[in-house]
Amino acid sequence: MLSIQHGCVEIEFHGGAQVVIEGPAELELITDMQVRCNQGKLYAEVPPRAVGFEILSPDVTVVDRGTEFGMEVTRAGTTEVHVFSGKVDYAVPLAPEGSMKLLEGKAILVHRSGESKTIPIRPASFTTAPPGGNSAAWEKSTALLRSDPTLVVQYTFDAASLASRTLRNHAPMAKPESHGTIVGCTPTEGRWPGKLALDFKLADDRVRFALNRQHERMTCVMWVKPEMTGKPFTALLMSSAAAPGEMQWQFDQNGRLVAGKRILAGWGDSNVEQIDTGKLLTPQRVGTWMQLAFVYDGSAGTFTHYLDGKKVEAGTISTNPPLVTARLEIGNWTPLDGSPPDAERGFVGSIDELLIFSRALHDDEIRNLWNIGREL
């Protein structure tokens, strides 16, 4: 029996399957082609030579057919199965259907009673490699996220994008206007050697793109290395218009992270509802890489801030209007005509990743994204 209280363990089986287990977990390694999981969360990558690799839980038996999949087994008597690529066969002991197939991009929740239902796939919930691994592990995790249909923006700041001056959106079904136009900005080193970023120094440096959507729920995750600007606000991701629902995400002059949306049309501050954190951009953090994230849940009327995978602030906000993303700017921000003359926002520093989801990510998903993406 293998018992893991905290952290992650990666096992490569003689048959070729690779499994990453996240604690707390209890596993029994039966053979090099069969594992029993009584509790825990795991990610499995199974090459062709290991087709038929089995993972058993008290609720379901999963037989791999050459794929990547994740499982979460709880003490409460449920098992989740998420298929990121390929397909698996699964059998529920108390269900009359016998063996069934679960295809790529699908996920199920199985109860110990034998009942099961389809659930949204959540690749960000699963750790694909132990934290602090290497760039290959980050690239694997980045590719895995593309199986999530709610991923609407994925900027990796890859070499081809920076060379072409167009920041490619790697999200599935990305629309042409969602690819970012790089204005100014120069390539620089990112979080680790070999990782690229964009450096923002001049007032015109920014990335422009459009994401013409209304969001009942939304998550933004950014890796950023901010410097002091000397201006009242340091812009991260801002909408260009002053229509109801338009979003804003920035630091204020006191180093507090601010996220919110415009409730009424117009540029006045009274038209905006926002949630502020305590001081996060301290002198010690200036010039260092950090993961920033916010989660907006319109049905609950909440904004939640995260720093380096940890929740730092949450607050309530009006449920209407929905959060709107139209024309957006990363970094320095200049609003459309009709705004007050002091409305511009500066940004000095580097950015090397941006993710936007059209759902509210869970705490563990934000933490996993930080774990796999932190500096090597």
Task: Please place each PLM-identified region on the residue numbering.
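Extended recognition patches within non-cytosolic domains
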Residues: E104, S113-E115, I119-P149, T302, ...
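Flexible, surface-exposed loop/linker segments and immediately adjacent secondary-structure boundaries
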Residues: M1, Q5-I108
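Extracellular/lumenal ectodomain signal focusing on beta-strand-rich modules
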Residues: Q39, S85, Q154, G184, ...
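Extracellular glycan-recognition modules
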Residues: D148-Q154, A159-H179, T188, D199-W267, ...
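Carbohydrate-binding surfaces in secreted/extracellular proteins
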Residues: F294-T316
